[in-house]
Amino acid sequence: MGAIMLLSGCCCRDCCRHNACCREEKTVKRSEPITMTMKKKSAKEIIKEAYGKVAETGSSCAVIGGGCCGGGCALSADVGYTREEIDTLADANLGLGCGHPVSLADIKPGNTVLDLGSGAGFDAFLAARKVGEKGKVIGVDMTPAMLAKARENAKKYKFDNVEFRQGDIEKLPVEDNSVDIIMSNCVINLAPDKAKVFKEAHRVLKSGGKMAVSDVVLLKKLTKEQKDDPKLLCACVSGAILKDDYIDMLKKAGFEVTVVDEDKTINKKWFGDEKLPISSLKFTARKK
């Protein structure tokens, strides 16, 4: 799970003809965008409803509306996924990420990997290929429709070393000291209490275990109007916090943080000419 795009435009049909976003029958009209205000529903309720619609339709157009919203394949290729990864797991790729955390994780055969906000299973399945038969991948997501889609995809792609659990990343349904690697792709920004997420991550990681994360952070504070916009919440913007605050939270939770890369052009890629002070941060964080 990750960013619901506000983009509109053509699908990448030539590179991803099987992707759900590229199926004409899945295109959702602009008559269905989010209309609720932040005051009427909690952030978690808004996110759950929005991503439930994405899971059911296979497109972020279910929430934002407009064309094909960029195409999952094109967006995924732009943040680092290979053509082979995209083509072989097309139904699991909803184009909701802001990076490629699996490539940061250095996953080994036999590892236990936890995916925070696992969505339709794309990153979880890529990790499952690396952990092999002796390893295990656990995906946690709070949206029932996403979990159903992920489990359906696990059967379709024949992954028996992946388990999807319903839960909140602020209160993980995972045992203490049981995970080698935690990965997450454009999800932690959606959590209202990020400090809790990092404390929970520290709890479930084994000694020396690490996080490998791509996430949206702010380069400067948003306006009140931007903070209160539910569409920007679901698009991984209004729930984001300042980069320095994000890193400080990780350190306070007991992690040694290494910033691997940062994409300050993500705003233009996602929103075109709309100027939003966001960056896609790629980092690892090792449990001390």
Question: Residue spans of the language-model regions?
Answer:
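Hydrophobic beta-strand segment of the Class I
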Residues: 113, 182-183
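Conserved SAM-binding strand-loop segment of SAM-dependent methyltransferases
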Residues: 157-170
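Short alpha-helix
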Residues: 238-254, 258-260
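A short glycine-rich, Lys/Arg-flanked "PGG" loop and its adjoining helix->strand segment in the class I
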Residues: 195-210
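A short acidic, Gly/Pro-enriched loop at the edge of an enzyme's catalytic core
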Residues: 109, 170-181
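Short, glycine-/aromatic-enriched active-site segment of Class I SAM-dependent methyltransferases
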Residues: 218-237
